[in-house]
């Protein structure tokens, strides 16, 4: 085994190229996240003190270490990374990591898991761009399962990977073909449904068909694959 391969196997390499995703921590959640984002094209770095049990491809690299360690993050080239996903099991470690990461890269998109929903404001204040509390989501689904099972089934269906559907977030820029059109107009586009709009007035689920799309809106689109 040549030296470069030894370093890659044990997680010793210093990353020099730009990175699409850094995943911090390895558990069931980070494994599910990895499976969803890995298209064998995006560059992905996994930082964990436990080596992931996955089939590594050329676009994926493992670094053995503490995700809140500044040196480890620098070796993972966090300064040139686009997104970092914090999936560690300990909320305190995640909060510390957010501070360090934001100091190293003010522009990186930090996506954080929080086990305790009460810590979400702290994570946002520390510099996380998006924060998710999986336990709160799971608890909500379990609480309504007995009385509204098909609501839960619909939610699980829409949030699961499907070969027939894609969910896209589309920012409406100046000059976009969507500007000035209503959602009713958009239905004329085959296999496209707008299921949410983020506007200057906030987020609206299942907006009215007469809503007129404006510059600055973000459209949540469900598109069916065309066969």
Language model features with spans:
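Cytosolic regulatory regions of ion transport systems
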Residues: 1-227
